[in-house]
């Protein structure tokens, strides 16, 4: 296996930003080189231990979905090889884990779509029988399928800050009613199409998060990563029914595995408070997480 890349260090291009997972470099005025590192974040904290091969797997999965969903919405890919804009010495940091994309005006909204009740959505439902202001029927259970997918947006947070759930009305205030309606419609459409396909491969996509930007003509464009285990809850169909019947979280292909370990770990007898620094992941958790990412891609695209 190739060595894990926690942080890229390209010198031939100006670094614009480091996100939780991706390092973005400027390529002229109108393009970006997005390098997917092997960093893992959980609870909006970047963990110290990289997951070997994760960046390449995320990139392959995003490219798979961009190709499959291209008819629904324009995306940020330029179609050019990322390797063409770096030096020969920098190729090992870029090959297989990068995308050369259009530079867009990012919209400050995380477009979250939920098809099942899980995570923070389940917690909120128990308190208010709604999620992000969307009222839901009584009697739903943890990991239960919703009658219809719901759009539950979040305000995009700075690195290290927690994304904050917001109402649809707040989205309208931020981007305007017309764009808000477009984001909601296309997000639900993409989710439904992807979830139906994934189901044929034995995978339930419980929820997912999209990011959009506007191009120079003001066209809504899908950007960043799409439908990866970092931005979505992936559940194998095996084990789902038993977990649902027991009211438990189903086994997953995403970083829920790491989240569960972090929730259970004790530091000096106390739970981790979800602020940096994070507890050190044991090698077996790193290895199992890497295997989960690989299995998800193999199953989906195989």
Swiss-Prot record:
UniProt pathway annotation: Purine metabolism; IMP biosynthesis via de novo pathway; 5-amino-1-(5-phospho-D-ribosyl)imidazole-4-carboxamide from 5-amino-1-(5-phospho-D-ribosyl)imidazole-4-carboxylate: step 1/2
Known EC number: 6.3.2.6
GO MF annotation list: ATP binding; phosphoribosylaminoimidazolesuccinocarboxamide synthase activity
Disulfide bonds: none
Pfam family, one: SAICAR_synt
Catalytic reaction equation(s): 5-amino-1-(5-phospho-D-ribosyl)imidazole-4-carboxylate + L-aspartate + ATP = (2S)-2-[5-amino-1-(5-phospho-beta-D-ribosyl)imidazole-4-carboxamido]succinate + ADP + phosphate + 2 H(+)
Gene Ontology CC, one term: cytoplasm
Family annotation (CDD domains): SAICAR_synt_Sc
Enzymatic class: ligase
UniProt cross-references to SUPFAM superfamilies, sorted A to Z: SAICAR synthase-like
Superkingdom of the source species: Bacteria
Coiled coil: none
GO biological process terms, semicolon-separated: 'de novo' IMP biosynthetic process
Keywords linked to the UniProt accession: ATP-binding, Ligase, Nucleotide-binding, Purine biosynthesis
Family: Belongs to the SAICAR synthetase family.
UniProt xrefs under HAMAP family: SAICAR_synth (MF_00137)
Name of the protein: Phosphoribosylaminoimidazole-succinocarboxamide synthase
Species classification: Bacteria, Pseudomonadati, Pseudomonadota, Betaproteobacteria, Burkholderiales
């Amino acid at each position: 296996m190739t060595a894990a890349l926690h942080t890229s260090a390209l010198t031939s291009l100006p670094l614009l930003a480091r996100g939780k997972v991706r390092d973005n470099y400027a390529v002229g005025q109108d393009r970006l080189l997005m390098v997917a590192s092997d960093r893992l974040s959980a609870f909006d904290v970047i963990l110290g231990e990289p997951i070997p091969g994760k960046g390449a797997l995320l990139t392959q999965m995003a490219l798979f979905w961009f190709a499959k969903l291209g008819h629904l919405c324009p995306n940020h890919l330029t179609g050019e090889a990322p390797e063409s804009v770096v030096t020969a010495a920098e190729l090992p940091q870029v090959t297989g884990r990068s995308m050369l994309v259009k530079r867009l005006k990012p919209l400050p909204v995380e477009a979250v779509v939920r098809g099942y009740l899980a995570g923070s959505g389940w917690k909120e439902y128990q308190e208010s029988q709604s999620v992000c202001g969307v009222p839901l029927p009584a009697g739903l259970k943890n990991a239960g399928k919703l009658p219809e997918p719901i759009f539950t947006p979040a305000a995009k947070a700075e690195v290290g800050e927690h994304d904050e759930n917001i109402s649809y009305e707040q989205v309208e205030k931020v981007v305007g009613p017309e764009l808000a309606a477009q984001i909601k419609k296309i997000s639900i459409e993409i989710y439904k199409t992807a979830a139906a396909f994934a189901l044929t491969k034995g995978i339930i996509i419980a929820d997912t998060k999209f990011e959009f930007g506007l191009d120079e003509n003001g066209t809504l464009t899908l950007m960043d990563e799409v439908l990866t285990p970092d931005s979505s809850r992936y559940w194998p169909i095996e084990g789902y029914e038993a977990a649902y019947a027991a009211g438990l979280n189903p086994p997953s292909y995403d970083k829920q595995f790491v989240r569960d370990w972090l929730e259970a770990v004790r530091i000096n007898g106390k739970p981790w408070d979800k602020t940096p620094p994070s507890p050190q992941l044991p090698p077996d958790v790193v290895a199992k997480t890497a295997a989960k990412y690989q299995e998800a891609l193999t199953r989906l695209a195989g």
